Amino acid sequence: MKNFALAILVVTFVVAVFGNTNLDPPTRPTRLRREAEPEAEPGNNRPVYIPQPRPPHPRLRREAEPEAEPGNNRPVYIPQPRPPHPRLRREAEPEAEPGNNRPVYIPQPRPPHPRLRREAEPEAEPGNNRPVYIPQPRPPHPRI
């Protein structure tokens, strides 16, 4: 199997390298850049067909409809406005009847998390004052 695959590779390489037996340069040079068409002579000016501009597509740009004449006014159907979607705007729920009032469970508010909001430390009593270390202010940075 290895020999068969190797033979295929060798044949492919030989065909790729030695397959082009025509070593002569091409007779017609390849045009790399497109050259301009030669200018038409002034005496050879014949009329050129220029088509009319196409009208705009009716769905892309519509002109305003012409005003109706006063005597030709007929009623136009105007649909009712749609109600708002129930999930977008809810009206207040109707009040319950007094005889049907039953207690509703309202949970107590949760205390704030201790790391999020701490109350101030309680003031020390005047008789229990001990000295507190207050560091010296740092000198300004030399580059500032």
Curated annotation (Swiss-Prot):
Q: Which residues form the signal peptide?
A: 1-19
Comp. bias regions, Pro residues: 134-144
For the region Disordered, give the residue spans: 20-144
Pfam family membership, one: Apidaecin
Print the keywords alphabetically.
Antibiotic, Antimicrobial, Cleavage on pair of basic residues, Immunity, Innate immunity, Repeat, Secreted, Signal
Which positions carry the propeptide annotation?
A: 20-42, 63-70, 91-98, 119-126
The reply to whether Ribosomal protein figures as a keyword in the UniProt entry is no
Q: List the disulfide bonds.
A: none
- Cellular localisation: Secreted
- Report the GO terms under cellular component: extracellular region
Q: Does the keyword Transport apply?
A: no
* Chain's role: Apidaecins have bactericidal activity; predominantly against Gram-negative bacteria. They seem to interfere with cell propagation.
Q: Which family does it belong to?
A: Belongs to the apidaecin family.
Q: What is this protein called?
A: Apidaecins type 22
Q: What is the protein's species of origin?
A: Apis mellifera
